[in-house]
Regions:
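N-terminal export leaders
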Residues: 5-9
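Extracytoplasmic small-molecule ligand-binding "clamshell" domains
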Residues: 28-111, 120
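Extended ligand-binding regions for polar small-molecule ligands
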Residues: 28-33, 72-81, 141, 148, ...
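Short helix-initiation/N-cap motifs at beta->coil->alpha
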Residues: 36, 88-98, 143-145, 161, ...
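Bilobed "Venus flytrap"/periplasmic-binding protein-like clamshell domains
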Residues: 49, 53-57, 67-80, 113, ...
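Acidic, polar ligand-binding/catalytic clefts
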Residues: 76, 80, 85-151, 217-218, ...
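A ligand-binding cleft/hinge motif common to bilobed small-molecule-binding domains
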Residues: 95-98, 112-120, 168-171, 192-226
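Periplasmic-binding protein-like
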Residues: 130-137, 203, 207-250, 268-276
């Protein structure tokens, strides 16, 4: 009887010790995961570092050299809601995802379309904006052309290296030649100069370029190609960051702030005198 009681006591003590160890391990792991989240890093640092590239009207320099546009507005609002400062880190598009993965900044907020191929490397929030691509053509070089005529070895497109339009052009117009540049402005300039027949970009960029250069450029088709959503991009294995950014986006979709801000930059022209 005494032996049995002693054995039961040993077994009970071992079980309790195991439970205590498991609880301690779980608590330690949870604390470790929380501490590793970029959200905790931002809070401790007091600054959120946002990677972006420059393209109108997502983000651009005004006459004083300051960043303005939809993305700076989103980034400033996000930082204010988190109670931290914001640091924008302009980065060329082709290297922006590698820079995020390398820890150069905390999140990409730069009109990045959510795609399965990008999702292999980074996680995306829910979309905070939606847009489509349109063709911007050199009027004289493409006069009388139908859409299918653009898929020809005699046609040259230009695009911003690493951006969604480059991939779309290669898939939609595989026979056409493709020139790649680091900025949308350089891509558009090739069309203006007559070195490329057309380029593609997200609206309202093409329509604005056509209005600024009515003698040379036009948007030949009233079609939004490859319409999709843009999300915040963040490093993998960070559920806290994903949860926070999603909740922030849902909140400001609900309040209407995101729509109002998007409409200001994409549907209006009150801001043009800041940059022209």
């Amino acid at each position: 009887m005494n032996i049995t009681r002693r054995l039961l006591g040993v077994a009970l003590s071992a079980a309790l010790a195991s439970i205590s160890f498991s609880q301690a391990t779980f608590a330690g792991t949870a604390q470790s995961l929380g501490a590793e989240s970029v959200i905790e890093t931002i809070k401790k640092r007091g600054v959120i570092k946002i990677g972006l590239d420059l393209f109108v009207p997502w983000s651009m320099r005004n006459k004083d050299g300051d960043l303005v546009g939809f993305e700076p507005d989103v980034g400033n609002k996000l930082a204010a809601d988190m109670g931290v400062e914001v640091e924008f880190i302009p980065t060329k598009w082709a290297g922006i995802i590698p820079a995020l993965v390398a820890g150069k900044f905390d999140v990409i907020i730069s009109g990045m379309t959510v795609t399965p191929s990008r999702n292999l490397t980074v996680n995306f929030s829910e979309p905070y904006a939606f847009s489509g691509l349109t063709i911007l053509s050199n009027t004289a070089m493409t006069k009388g052309m139908a859409l299918e005529d653009y898929n020809s070895e005699d046609i040259t497109f230009s695009c911003r290296r690493g951006a969604t339009p480059c991939v779309f052009i290669q898939n939609k117009f595989p026979k056409a030649k493709l020139l790649m540049f680091d900025e949308d402005g350089a891509s558009t300039q090739e069309v203006l100069n007559g070195n490329a027949h057309a380029t593609m970009a997200t609206e309202p960029g093409p329509s604005q370029d056509a209005r600024r250069n009515p003698e040379t450029l036009n948007v030949p088709f009233n079609i939004a190609f490859d319409a999709g959503g843009e999300g915040f991009a963040m490093r993998k294995s960070d559920p806290d960051a994903l949860a926070y950014f999603n909740s922030w986006i849902r909140r400001h979709n609900h309040t209407g702030w995101l729509k109002t801000t998007h409409d200001y930059w994409f549907r209006g022209d009150a801001w043009h005198d800041q940059v022209e």
